[in-house]
């Protein structure tokens, strides 16, 4: 069986391609998921993709990924700026974690500049559009192949 990488997408990402294409691009979530599946296959991994508009469901999927997935990619969308529950759940995951945002959150409204998720992620990719997911897959694949070591859960949240 192939090694699994879980990809989680948060609220409103089911409307990609329709919602603010000047910010998020014209690619649909289905296109992004298919691109990730195809690229993961080339990297000899398998991906499981999920999307929800509900914070609690994201937490449950993170918990399910513990012990089942080798790596995790999360685009928490707006929950990145507000969810301590997602931050806490991610801290329990022992594999590499990459936070992805399609847009550059640091060039947008001030309330989007901070992400709780970033404090529990090994890497953060912003502003690269749908290709950010592919970069995240590449990063996780390299980490897993070359001896990933979990970083300290100590954070600098203030």
Curated annotation (Swiss-Prot):
Q: Give a GO biological-process term.
A: amino acid biosynthetic process
- Family matches, as Pfam families: DHquinase_II
Q: Which InterPro entries match?
A: DHquinase_II (IPR001874), DHquinase_II_CS (IPR018509), DHquinase_II_sf (IPR036441)
Q: Which domain of life is it from?
A: Bacteria
Stated EC number for the protein is: 4.2.1.10
UniProt subunit comment: Homododecamer.
List the Gene3D superfamilies hit by this protein, alphabetically. Answer: Dehydroquinase, class II
Residues the record annotates as the site (Transition state stabilizer) are 19
Native organism? Bartonella bacilliformis (strain ATCC 35685 / KC583 / Herrer 020/F12,63)
The entry marks the following residues as binding substrate, namely: 75, 81, 88, 102-103, 112
Give the function comment from the record.
Answer: Catalyzes a trans-dehydration via an enolate intermediate.
Q: Can you tell me which residues the record assigns to a coiled coil?
A: none
Write the record's keywords in alphabetical order, separated by commas. Amino-acid biosynthesis, Aromatic amino acid biosynthesis, Lyase
Q: Which PROSITE patterns match?
A: DEHYDROQUINASE_II
What is the protein name stated in its UniProt record?
3-dehydroquinate dehydratase
Which GO molecular function entries does the Swiss-Prot or TrEMBL record give?
Answer: 3-dehydroquinate dehydratase activity
């Amino acid at each position: 069986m192939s090694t699994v990488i879980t990809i989680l997408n948060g609220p409103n990402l089911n409307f990609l391609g329709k919602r603010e294409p000047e910010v998020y691009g014209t690619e649909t979530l289905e296109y992004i998921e298919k691109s990730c599946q195809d690229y993961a296959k080339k990297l000899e991994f398998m991906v499981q993709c999920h999307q929800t508009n509900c914070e609690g469901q994201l937490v449950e999927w993170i918990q399910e990924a513990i012990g089942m997935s080798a790596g995790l990619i999360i685009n928490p969308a707006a929950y990145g700026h507000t969810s301590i529950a997602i931050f806490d759940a991610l801290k329990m995951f022992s594999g590499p974690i990459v936070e992805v945002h399609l847009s550059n959150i640091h060039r947008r409204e001030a309330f989007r500049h901070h992400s709780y998720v970033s404090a529990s992620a090994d890497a953060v990719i912003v502003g690269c559009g749908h290709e950010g997911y592919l970069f995240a897959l590449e990063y996780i694949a390299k980490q897993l192949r070359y001896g990933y070591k979990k970083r300290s859960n100590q954070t600098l949240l203030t």
